[in-house]
């Protein structure tokens, strides 16, 4: 690809931009993060053993956001999670930056915080020095422990004797045979360690028996690729008149869209106060959980049921994006500012990419009688970030389409998690991708939290199914079919699964606002990637991921109900998630509601997924459904792209 000069084709928010607070929903600035840490550190209960899980904006009430006028004073408050290095438990604090005080504190004595980035980085060296782990490696022919690569995983909650009441991490290992080569081609099978993150001790080394370490290399870095295909001719994305969007204090406007871009350590990208042409669509949208269940019960692989958002926090794992590769075109970058365990400011430069893309044909019609044609091209605004969680990359894309649709796409790439087998004997739960190297069948199941506000906060939830009319007097030719709508008016009624047989879909409607046809304005959820979970609901992993049992859930808005697997779900028993929220069976008709959509990827591993996996994608769309009185893009000017030309004229 052709990469243009950074100074011409990209812009990153300046330090002054990052320090200016222009909107109540704007993420905390570096100065605010540091100030919050200082306020907490000077409070008597918190001392040298205190660490920070999260420091993030305490989002103001909706009425505050709705009534805000630019230039008005902005009250700033933070939500903080702190924990001790010595004891179990998490304390949730609310901190006023205006008053320099802690305004609220709540103890969660059995909770464990997310595993922190600093802990992950320390675990490898710690495990490599443990005598039992060294002995296990030696039994496999490894004498140089510097070649051993250790990936920490969350330990889950499996009631293993000796693990109760601890804060644990479980590890898998590989061997790197030479500098920079792909160590995932050399799994150290059957050797795992369990680490207590409070006492920093290896409480157990599990050795299930040695399998020869595969030695064939499978590399992806350019220095190892000796035979390369002929380069493709460049495609340049240029906007000679500049971009059509504007970013100020996180507030983004483009065409008829306006919204605020946020970011935190747990969810990564968050979107707020989403409006189209001044009409509200959603108050908040983000990806709030993902669980990755693996299908193998062999050795220590039964533990592979990781919640990348709730147990790790993908925001801290965001990449600094590279112009011309991660993002192509004329780019606006945003830096993000998070906290370290010690309360210092951690800045990830260019973590968010904003740009426009041509999106193909929007609409067209040729009147063959008059030989007249009208054509309009589509365009979309893209807001994205890419997070690396160990072996996998998760690329999050929010698309805002010119026709009023909102789309989320998750692209998964990186390297499959590998294990070893005897060559040619992968077993029933895996596929061999290299002699002696397997990838286990697994799933990536995601949950988006969509705090809808379709023309306001008073919304209802409607299910639509299509049925064939029974043959008979009303259907004499057997061709009749129709759509039936049902208002689901309580939380338990709205816990639903997809049904391809009836082409089921769901709408969020505002019963108080109607279109010209007299029907409620609405947005439709296009649930295109529903998956069937295979983990038993009654298993340890199934209880902790009960949200995957339905494809949609709808709850009455509660600001404390933020995550479908629970607020503190590291080592959780499954309580405190959305399955518990809906037991209240609150009314969800003509009120403030939250739509939770569960979708994902079913991934039987392919040979083509190794040594590095081409992107596979999943996602959903929110599309206007009677929100407008007609095609909202009928007013687009007719334009012809003058830069386009015939291929033969371009010298090919």
List each language-model region with its residue ranges.
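Hydrophobic or amphipathic alpha-helical targeting/insertion segments
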Residues: 87-89, 93-121, 125-129, 133, ...
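Terminal targeting/leader modules
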Residues: 1-28, 34-50, 64-68, 84-106, ...
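Extended effector regions of multi-domain proteins
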Residues: 2-13, 35, 97-115, 138-139, ...
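Short, non-transmembrane alpha-helical segments in secretory-pathway proteins
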Residues: 24-66, 116-155
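Exposed beta-strand-loop-beta-strand "reactive/processing" segments of non-cytosolic proteins
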Residues: 47-97, 144-196, 243, 255-257, ...
